[in-house]
Design a protein with these regions (language model features):
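Charged docking surfaces used in two-component/phosphorelay signaling
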Residues: 69, 164-372
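N-terminal Rossmann-like NAD(P) cofactor-binding subdomain of oxidoreductases
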Residues: 1-217, 257-261, 328-329, 333-339, ...
Length: 372
């Protein structure tokens, strides 16, 4: 039976991965082992009535007994442990949620509804390192898979509106704490006063700027605001998150660097767990809305086309509607009034913790289980 080690299973992405594996009965037919960086010997999860005992996630010997390792423990863990495992002589498969090894020449970025052929080729070629992609990129590509398959995209400008969950569990808690801080400092009379709303607006603005506003993790208020920069400053006007757009898109698709130019801005918004992206596309030819709908909806089962009208968009193309769902919404398709070029706009919305993080890892595990 295939020995599968799971690390980081108590974190936000790891918890979603564990939930999805239980829902899909992925523990049937594998011998699962749960590892911990801090609680080795302690109690792990209970699955099918069996209480698992945690193993030491820093033990190279214990890890080396695994045929497949899935880690959601983060980049620092990956950078410390993966090279040590290889030096020890481990020949197993490493499936990773962290970004540390995404651009490594040994790695295949996994998003099988979009790049299954590349994944199969990598397995056939002996690749053992499989890494989940950047969440905003993977969710956008999930929506655009039909256009990608038809080789229609010339370039993309991607403006992302990224949720707190993309930054981590502490950031989700902080966003909720910011909301609580504002609400706790407003009285019912202030909220229900039928007079001018301006005093209420001014007070909320003061609360947002208050030095008591919890900002230890974000470094700035997000509730009632945005954070116009994600990840490090590359010094050329781009954030590292924006650089990932082109670099990872082309690698996911198995294309030479720069084949599809991608750029834009990555913005943090006050949403819990769904990323959205407003995408301007230059296509290689004109595409009608009917053809666009056919292309995207026939690409894979997890894309939901939303007609470009107000009622459908407000009802079905929002984080509130899509959160917790495997469906990636795509809509607001229209031709831009920019000369006569085939330039179009679309909006994608997807759950950052599912297709943006955990689901590609879970599916990669099953691809390997069916191959080894």
């Amino acid at each position: 039976m295939t020995q599968v080690g799971i690390i980081g299973w108590r974190g936000m992405v790891g918890s979603v991965l564990l939930q999805r594996m239980l829902e899909e009965n992925d523990f049937n037919g594998i011998s699962a082992h749960f590892f911990s960086t801090s609680s080795a010997g302690g109690h792990g999860p209970v699955i099918d009535g069996i209480r698992y005992t945690l193993k030491d996630a820093h033990s190279i010997e214990a890890l080396a007994e695994m045929d497949i390792i899935i880690t959601c423990q983060g980049g620092e863990y990956t950078k410390a442990i993966y090279p040590a495992l290889l030096e020890y002589g481990w020949k197993g498969y490493w499936i990773d949620a962290a970004s540390a090894l995404r651009m490594d020449e040994r790695a295949c970025i996994i998003l099988d509804p979009v790049n299954r052929k590349n994944i199969d080729r990598a397995v056939n070629d002996g690749i053992k390192l499989f890494v989940g992609g950047n969440c905003s990129i993977t969710l956008s590509l999930m929506g655009l898979a039909g256009l990608i398959n038809a080789d229609l995209i010339e370039w993309m400008s991607v403006m992302t509106y990224q949720s707190a969950s993309g930054a981590g569990a502490k950031h989700v808690r902080e966003l909720i704490a910011q909301s609580a801080y504002i609400s706790q400092n407003l009285s019912p009379d202030e909220l229900e006063n039928p007079g001018s709303v301006l005093p209420l607006v001014n007070k909320v603005s003061e609360l947002i700027r208050s030095d008591k506003m919890p900002i230890d993790n974000f470094g700035a208020p997000l509730m009632g605001s945005i954070i116009p920069w994600i990840d490090s400053d590359l010094g050329d006007g781009n954030s590292r998150e924006e650089w990932k757009g082109e670099a990872e898109t082309n690698k996911i698709l198995g294309l030479p660097v720069g084949t599809i130019p991608v750029n834009g801005l990555c913005i943090r918004v006050g949403v819990i767990r769904c990323h959205s992206a407003a995408i301007t596309l230059k296509l290689k030819r004109e595409v009608s809305e009917a053809e666009f709908e056919a292309l995207v909806t026939h690409s894979h089962p997890w894309v939901n086309y939303v007609p470009n009208n107000k009622e459908a968009s407000v009802a079905h193309l929002t984080p509130a509607h899509i959160s917790g769902s495997l469906q990636v919404g795509i809509g607001r398709f229209k031709k831009m009034a920019l000369n006569n070029d085939p330039i179009y706009s679309v909006l994608t919305v997807g759950d950052q913790l599912l297709w943006g993080a955990a689901e590609p890892l879970r599916r990669m595990l099953n691809i390997l289980l069916n191959r080894i």
